[in-house]
């Protein structure tokens, strides 16, 4: 805001306050004249919307005049010093402004963006300079809104003293300790000279790191920060503490705290907390969570500590939680909490935690509890009863690799039932209803059960009866439910508009239910011309990829009625051109027709009528290749239509996709984020060189069977500054060590499969320095690597959550040693990397890596010829174990009798999958 002083007469002066950005203000644009004699009558809210304000003041009131400081009305700046306020009689104005500041910072409902962070910093500077006592209010306000403050572009300009003061506030409110740590590290990185990052001597700023409760960080985050210059020691201690807590079978406070207080285990949970994010914390168990819901004190009384320890022992021995007296714990209530995320918390007894969520979080609407296998789906009704306001639940687990339509089963073994409860009331038979008989209607609108093989038709029927408001259901890879079970849900939940049912038994009965007129339940409804009352007509999302039970006729009937659909996945179905020609919707944003028999013309027909299309997935469609010569201006009709009408964010193509197709697509891919080219596509080196130019905002680039070279890959890494995922799989043209010298600090996922056979340990070391933030790494066919590469991987990428090594020389010839230091791993595949893996490797890995859910190995690498299989107690967090076995095939060398050699040929794969009820063992032909 600019200001100047005009002389009106001998006794009065006028201060003109002009907003430099007044064009952006709403409201009356006329100037207004006010007087300092009427400060008490000023309407600050109204004044804040005026582009020009004229303030009249009596000259006789001047005592001292100077310039250059700051006072604020809302977020509008007037340049003057504190002493100059007396000239205009603004001492009263200061009181008004201070009163306003007290009001606005005390209002929980005020949304922070109404206040500019830069202005708040100026207010803080002004108050500190002039010893005004509103600083505590201001720091408290920023502490309560710390997440907003950290998200502001000017966060790095916040003075250290102000930041430290905010972090030390008891009311500091953050979603998780990870968010606090990340914000502090970002601030330090922006305010620390590179030469000072390796040493904290002479700098008081690293003291702020001691305010981080490192024992409460998520394991992947803490492990990944072990390479952070000024946080490496803290991160190392954090990982040790987390793994120690996760390994403790019992929660004994005295042992954990060593006689100290509980502050380091106190989650930042305040009366202002809206989101509680504990995801990825294997150290979080029920007693530790309960500790944070009890009244805060430096030391718990002995009786309460004893109760916590007893609770831990009861849960360890799988005691029926209905026998536990929860009322003995005086938990606090946090009214503001609406979202709780405990995904990837394997030690948390979710069933028992629900008891406390219902008491401490009465406003809870969203619960994310993905990858918690111990939660039995039969307890879902208990969750709905205890937390009646819940509207969104996520119980996702990893999808089983044993999808009936995708594998050839050689043999299967009787399921081993998991008996962990001492309660005679806990039924584990799949045919027993999972809910109590006393129905209570739930407010659930969104339910995610992806991958839950312990979910049956009876469970689905009870959901249909108890959740009439259900709008979105995710049943992807729920292989235990049937077509009839899903159809009953569809019939009863008439509010459904989003269905995810990929790789299930979704079939003809479901189609009948969707296409039936919801106001008429007779057979005539299917034949009526007006289908606007059918559920299919109202669908917004329908994902049924991989569902082989839908024939062409049913699919045509279904698609012809989905006129309002926004997202449609039909991959690996019996989809043909006629079905797409029947599609009359115009709101489509995502279409997946991969591995179907559709043609360019049919897909082009859909594209032409849906200009809002942002995502097209059409890999594996061989019929797209047949129309390669059907071109308009050297481009197939499909790509011509895409380039003419769409602004794509994701595209996945294969057969028939060429350099000319890329040229035709150019207008549509300027803002592309994900680009996948699969088998049958042929961009060539020239086409790949154009990708960074055509798609400068790419974040994901995945190439299968493409021709690549050093220059192509280096151009991609050096030009695409936002690239986070790069996969080069089975590509033609060897890439050398030159590409590993390109820096890609934003890269998070890297796959090099059969493209870098000459990679050495030194190359891997260079790669770890230039792509230091990887969280997922897959190397296949790097035959020159040896056991030393384990050190490079564990030291270079300590925060890895996924590691796949296959046909990589002698990496495991001396056993698996250093890789055990990748303690945040969730997915580990080691195959054909050298004979040397110990028999007990799977059990040992599960005990050392608290978050490990998936393991894949090959008997060829087993030092003793086999692997021990974990029992229920030994599996820890394991969900899927795949053990491949090869046969040695004799291969004759030439026509001589000088000798023969053998080569391993895949024979079968043993798959073990655990869920909340049982262990399933299956042998399949495929190498999974």
Regions found by a protein language model. Name each.
Residues 2-70, 77:
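N-terminal BTB/POZ boundary and linker segment
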Residues 79-80, 89-92, 101, 105, ...:
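Eukaryotic basic, amphipathic alpha-helical target segments in cytosolic regions
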Residues 82-83, 121-125, 139, 151-152, ...:
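Amphipathic alpha-helical repeat scaffolds
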Residues 279, 287-288, 293-335, 349, ...:
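C-terminal capping region of solenoid repeat domains
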């Amino acid at each position: 805001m600019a200001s100047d002083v005009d002389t009106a007469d001998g006794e009065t002066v006028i201060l003109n306050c002009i907003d430099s950005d007044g064009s952006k203000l709403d409201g009356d644009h006329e100037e207004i004249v006010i007087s300092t004699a009427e400060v008490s009558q000023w309407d600050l809210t109204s004044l804040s919307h005026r582009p020009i304000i004229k303030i009249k003041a009596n000259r006789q009131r001047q005592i001292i005049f100077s310039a250059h400081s700051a006072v604020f009305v809302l977020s509008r700046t007037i340049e003057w010093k504190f002493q100059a306020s007396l000239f205009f009689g603004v001492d009263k104005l200061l009181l008004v402004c201070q009163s306003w500041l007290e009001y606005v910072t005390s209002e929980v409902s005020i949304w922070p963006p109404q206040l500019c962070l830069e202005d708040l910093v100026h207010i803080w500077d002004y108050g500190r300079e002039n010893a005004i006592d509103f600083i505590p209010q201001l720091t408290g306000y920023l502490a309560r809104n710390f997440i907003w403050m950290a998200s502001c572009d000017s966060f790095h300009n916040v003075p250290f003293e102000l930041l430290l003061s905010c972090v030390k506030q008891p009311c500091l409110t953050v979603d998780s300790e990870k968010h606090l740590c990340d914000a502090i590290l970002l601030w330090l990185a922006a305010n620390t000279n590179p030469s000072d990052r390796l040493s904290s001597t002479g700098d008081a700023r690293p003291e702020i790191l001691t305010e981080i409760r490192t024992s409460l960080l998520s394991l992947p985050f803490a492990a990944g920060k072990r390479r952070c210059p000024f946080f490496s020691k803290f991160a190392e201690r954090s990982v040790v503490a987390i793994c120690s807590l996760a390994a403790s079978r019992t929660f004994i406070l005295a042992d954990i705290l060593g006689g100290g207080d509980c502050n380091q285990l106190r989650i930042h949970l305040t009366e202002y907390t809206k989101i509680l994010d504990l995801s990825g914390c294997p150290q979080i168990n029920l007693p530790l969570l309960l500790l944070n819901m009890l009244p805060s004190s430096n030391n718990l009384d002995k009786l309460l500590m004893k109760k916590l320890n007893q609770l831990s022992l009861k849960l360890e021995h799988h005691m029926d939680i209905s026998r536990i007296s929860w009322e003995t714990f005086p938990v606090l209530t946090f009214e503001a909490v609406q979202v709780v995320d405990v995904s990837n918390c394997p030690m948390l007894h979710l069933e028992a935690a629900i008891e406390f969520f219902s008491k401490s979080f009465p406003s809870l609407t969203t619960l994310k509890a993905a990858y918690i296998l111990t939660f039995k789906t039969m307890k879902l009704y208990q969750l709905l009863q205890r937390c009646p306001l819940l509207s969104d639940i996520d119980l996702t687990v990893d999808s089983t690799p044993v999808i009936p339509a995708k594998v050839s089963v050689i043999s299967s073994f009787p399921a081993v039932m998991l008996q962990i409860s001492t309660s005679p009331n806990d039924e584990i038979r799949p045919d027993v209803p999972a809910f109590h008989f006393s129905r209570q209607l739930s407010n659930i609108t969104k339910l995610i059960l992806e991958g839950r093989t312990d979910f049956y038709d009876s469970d689905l029927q009870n959901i249909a009866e108890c959740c009439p408001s259900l709008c979105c259901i995710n049943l992807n890879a729920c292989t235990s439910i049937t077509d009839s079970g899903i159809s009953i849900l569809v019939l009863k939940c008439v509010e459904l508009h989003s269905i995810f049912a990929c790789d299930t038994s979704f079939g003809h009965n479901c189609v009948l239910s969707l296409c039936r007129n919801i106001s008429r339940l007779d057979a005539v409804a299917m034949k009526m011309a007006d289908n606007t009352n059918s559920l299919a007509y109202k669908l917004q999302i329908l994902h049924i990829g991989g569902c082989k039970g839908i024939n062409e006729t049913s699919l045509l009937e279904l698609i012809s009625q989905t006129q309002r659909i926004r997202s449609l996945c039909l991959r690996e179905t019996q989809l043909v051109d006629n079905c797409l020609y029947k599609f009359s919707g115009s709101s489509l944003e995502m279409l997946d027709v991969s591995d179907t028999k559709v043609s360019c013309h049919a897909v082009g027909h859909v594209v032409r009528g849906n200009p809002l299309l942002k995502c097209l997935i059409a890999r594996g469609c061989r019929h797209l290749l047949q129309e390669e010569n059907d071109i308009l201006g050297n481009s197939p009709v499909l790509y011509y239509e895409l380039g003419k009408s769409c602004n794509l964010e994701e595209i996945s193509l294969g057969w028939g996709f060429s350099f000319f197709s890329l040229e035709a697509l150019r207008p549509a891919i300027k803002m592309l984020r994900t680009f996948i080219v699969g088998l049958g596509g042929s961009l060539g080196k020239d086409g790949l060189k154009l990708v960074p130019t055509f798609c400068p905002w790419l974040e994901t680039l995945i190439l299968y069977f493409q021709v690549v070279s050093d220059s192509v890959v280096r151009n991609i890494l050096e030009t695409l500054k936002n690239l986070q995922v790069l996969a080069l799989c089975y590509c033609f043209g060897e890439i050398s060590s030159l590409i590993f010298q390109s820096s890609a600090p934003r890269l998070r996922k890297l796959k090099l499969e059969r493209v870098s056979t000459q990679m050495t340990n030194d190359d891997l070391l260079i790669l770890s320095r230039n792509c230091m933030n990887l969280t997922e790494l897959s190397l296949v066919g790097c035959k020159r690597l040896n056991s030393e590469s384990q050190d490079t991987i564990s030291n270079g990428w300590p925060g890895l959550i996924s590691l796949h090594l296959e046909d990589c020389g002698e990496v495991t010839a001396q056993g698996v040693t250093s890789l055990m230091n990748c303690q945040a791993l969730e997915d580990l595949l080691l195959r054909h990397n050298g004979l040397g893996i110990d028999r007990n490797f799977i059990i040992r890995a599960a005990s050392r890596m608290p978050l490990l859910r998936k393991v894949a190995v090959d008997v060829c690498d087993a030092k003793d010829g086999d692997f021990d299989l974990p029992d229920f107690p030994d599996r820890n967090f394991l969900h899927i174990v795949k053990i491949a076995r090869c046969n040695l095939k004799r291969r004759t060398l030439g026509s001589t009798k000088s000798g023969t050699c053998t080569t391993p040929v895949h024979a079968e794969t043993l798959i073990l999958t655990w869920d909340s009820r049982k262990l399933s063992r299956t042998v399949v032909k495929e190498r999974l």
